[in-house]
């Protein structure tokens, strides 16, 4: 029963409207246009409300955050009392001086600093850098040369980064043996799995390093259960994302070596902006069509993924297609997250022996008709899965083919 689940995952993911960037909106490159709704115009000509848009130190062009007013000067000291008139001669005896007032109580202690954000030691204002004593950013985030913590290439890559950078993070993960994923799959195996990714349209956008760095944001991905379960989860994830990004070279003798060939698979000739949820208002000119390792689609998926990852993907959807780490993070997020209150792909896979009735999960998922009509795509997903299991040295699991044997005896036919 365990790996009937895997087939469901491939079908669910394929039928999910799985979840390409625009001209500047404001500022000097947009003819001096201002942002609507009092939003700030960033150095790069986009509208937003966070420090990267509004802080003049970050290059804000218009409608920026105002500098705080200087503190009010202290009130002037009271005027000294007028001098006492000279006493008559002979002066009367002076009265005894009044008792000195009691000492003022000490000032109250300053309040304690605000606690750091949940999950890490990062400052509440997300500032970092040498001028502040090199405070750490949260795990998976980097300190940029502009003294802000963040998780994109603008913060983490090369000369843009001060510390906790991608290169140093990757070296530490592998050399210290602290990352369970790198123990299961090496760079040489990954490159052999996706042997054509450098001569496909993606031109090497996807990489082992980007994948390993992305996994650090998901501590339960590929690390749950015994080694067999963990290898199968990686094989299933790679099969899912390979099917989404396949080069579709079905005239080839080897159909299953063409994963990670596309970044924006559905953008050519597609005018749909996929702004389908009013809960996530779409800025003018932004499109939410398929991007990245899981071909993320629809504004609500960009919104939810960005919320989970601490990124503004509604205003910057092209990060999924231009930053390989973010591309993999959105794919792993999609794998790990629940959708429509259904079990996540991760949960279904690791609980396949926990008594779940897989057929009921499929029937309740809302994708039954698509599942039946896309048997061929699911079979291709199985082909990818088998190849990756072989390369990771793990068995496929039981009952793998009984769901899609294309006969009236299959589980799908009985649904």
From Swiss-Prot:
Q: Which residues form the Chitin-binding type-1 domain?
A: 23-66, 125-167
One Gene Ontology biological process? defense response to fungus
Cite the post-translational modification comment: Glycosylated.
Kindly list the cysteine pairs connected by disulfide bridges: 26-41, 35-47, 40-54, 60-64, 128-143, 137-149, 142-156, 161-165
Q: What is its main location?
A: secreted
Repeat in keyword set:
yes
Q: Per UniProt, which keywords does this protein have?
A: Chitin-binding, Disulfide bond, Glycoprotein, Plant defense, Repeat, Secreted, Signal
Per the UniProt entry, the signal peptide is: 1-21
Where is it localised? Secreted
What is an example of a Pfam family matching this protein?
Glyco_hydro_19
* Residues with glycosylation annotation: 264
Q: Name one GO molecular function term.
A: chitin binding
The record's listing under PROSITE patterns reads:
CHIT_BIND_I_1, CHIT_BIND_I_2, CHITINASE_19_1, CHITINASE_19_2
Sorted alphabetically, the Gene Ontology cellular component annotations on this record are:
extracellular region
- What domain of life? Eukaryota
Biological function: Chitin-binding protein which slows larval growth when consumed by the lepidopteran species S.ricini and M.brassica, but not when consumed by the mulberry specialist B.mori. Lacks chitinase activity.
Q: What else is known?
A: On the 2D-gel the determined MW of this protein is: 56 kDa.
Protein name per its UniProtKB record: Mulatexin
Q: Which organism is it from?
A: Morus alba
């Amino acid at each position: 029963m365990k790996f009937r689940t895997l087939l469901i995952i491939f079908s669910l993911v394929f039928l999910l409207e799985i979840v390409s960037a625009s001209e500047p909106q404001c500022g000097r490159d947009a003819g001096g246009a201002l942002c609507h709704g009092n939003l700030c115009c960033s150095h790069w000509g986009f509208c937003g409300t966070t420090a990267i848009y509004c802080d003049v130190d970050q290059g804000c062009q218009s409608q920026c955050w105002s500098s705080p007013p200087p503190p009010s000067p202290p009130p002037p000291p009271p005027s000294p009392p007028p001098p006492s008139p000279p006493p008559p001669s002979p002066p009367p005896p002076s009265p005894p001086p009044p008792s000195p007032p009691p000492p003022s109580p000490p000032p109250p202690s300053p309040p304690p600093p605000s606690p750091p954000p949940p999950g890490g030691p990062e400052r509440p204002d997300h500032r970092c850098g040498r001028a502040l004593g090199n405070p750490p950013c949260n795990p998976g985030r980097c300190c940029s040369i502009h003294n802000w913590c963040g998780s994109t290439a603008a913060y983490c890559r090369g000369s843009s980064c001060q510390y906790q950078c991608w290169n140093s993070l990757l070296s530490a993960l592998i050399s210290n043996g602290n990352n369970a994923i790198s123990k299961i799959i090496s760079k040489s195996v990954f490159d052999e799995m996706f042997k054509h990714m450098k001569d496909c349209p993606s031109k090497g956008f996807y990489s082992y390093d980007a994948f390993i760095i992305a996994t650090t944001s998901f501590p339960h991905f590929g690390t749950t259960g015994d080694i067999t379960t963990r290898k199968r989860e990686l094989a299933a994830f790679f099969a899912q994302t390979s099917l989404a990004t396949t080069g579709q070279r079905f005239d080839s003798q080897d159909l299953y070596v063409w994963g990670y060939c596309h970044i924006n698979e559905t953008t050519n000739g597609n005018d749909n902006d996929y702004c389908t949820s009013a809960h996530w208002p779409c800025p003018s000119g932004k499109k939410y069509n398929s991007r990245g390792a899981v071909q993320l689609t629809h504004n609500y998926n960009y919104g939810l993924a960005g919320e989970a990852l601490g990124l503004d993907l509604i205003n910057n959807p092209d990060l999924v297609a231009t930053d390989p780490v973010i591309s993999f993070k959105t794919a792993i997020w999609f794998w790990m997250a629940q959708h429509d209150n259904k079990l996540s792909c991760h949960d279904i896979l690791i609980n396949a022996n926990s008594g779940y009735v897989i057929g009921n999960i499929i029937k309740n998922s809302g994708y039954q008709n698509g599942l039946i009509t896309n048997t061929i795509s699911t079979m291709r997903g199985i082909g990818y899965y088998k190849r990756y299991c072989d390369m990771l040295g793990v068995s496929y699991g039981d009952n793998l083919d009984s769901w899609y044997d294309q006969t009236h005896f299959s589980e799908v036919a009985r649904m």
